[in-house]
Amino acid sequence: MKKIFYGLIVSGSLFLPICGFGQMGMMEGRMNMSMIRHHFVMQNGIDPNYVSKVNPLERNAENIAAGKKLYETSCALCHGITGLGDGDGGKDLKPPPANIAMFIKMHNVPDGYLYWTIAEGGIPLQTAMPPFKDVMQESEIWKIIIFLREL
């Protein structure tokens, strides 16, 4: 009886990712943008100017609060308040905005990758995310990254 029970649990856990979770399953929806970006990086790498970047700012309450404020005014419209990619501004985007909250917890994401993503936006991937390198100071981008690591 225990073997059958455990067999059903294992089978179910293997089957659920295939089914997805509604319209936003693992192979479509919010996670898809993260996978598209990851595939692009695996094929092309990222701009060498970003590869070795490391956040120079201290991870403290002041920088987290500043990053949160910047995120809320510049990112939350599309990525949602909690970073799930469910903001009203991103509902009709194809591909939809990335689920940052899940992505940042699933991977050991280097600072340079996050900086590149925010600075260059969707330009390398021809998506709707605007580049922020010309409208934000470096320190502002770093503060957003500090906040994202708290999601």
Predicted regions and their residues:
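Electrostatic cytochrome c docking/interface patches
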Residues: 39-70
